[in-house]
């Protein structure tokens, strides 16, 4: 694994300690070698499906898939890509809830490698530190860019924000459509899945939790 920041290392260790890290191994090959190997195998998979890779629309698809896997939709498996964090001392003594709603979520179901599409809401009560609002979106995106199950993703986000912000007072709410349900199997186009995770005051105080949910469920 490439060199990673202290924040990334702390988050990774916290996930491992809680048993909620994505099951993955440190690759032994360089990225270029991995892209070449994936493209070679995808070429064979597509032939087995019955596609003619001599067609100019298909011939570069194995390479496109390899690049997409390594550099894009699974880039969150490499903690070297963890967002750079600039924590700001809470000198203004902000004590009200900070909440970001409707963060775009696009991830990949680890069971069938099809899309998970939804929204994420994150809230926290600052203690000693705050972070830029865009960093919240970037952290969500990082953990979405790996094969996922929604339940684990929700817990990973909770732990990541608790670790970075150095507070237990964090809430995460995820609402998503799973294309493994929508595009195959039962082919249900209407259902969605909701998961949530709470820490600190959000877990202990019902009124605080209700205040958070009142905005995300509008």
Curated annotation (Swiss-Prot):
This enzyme's EC code(s): 3.5.4.16
One BP annotation, GO: tetrahydrofolate biosynthetic process
Gene3D superfamilies the UniProt entry points to: 1.10.286.10, 3.30.1130.10
Catalytic activity: GTP + H2O = 7,8-dihydroneopterin 3'-triphosphate + formate + H(+)
Cellular component GO terms held in the UniProt record: cytoplasm
PANTHER family cross-referenced by the UniProt entry: GTP CYCLOHYDROLASE 1 (PTHR11109:SF7), GTP CYCLOHYDROLASE I (PTHR11109)
The protein's name: GTP cyclohydrolase 1
Gene designation per UniProt: folE
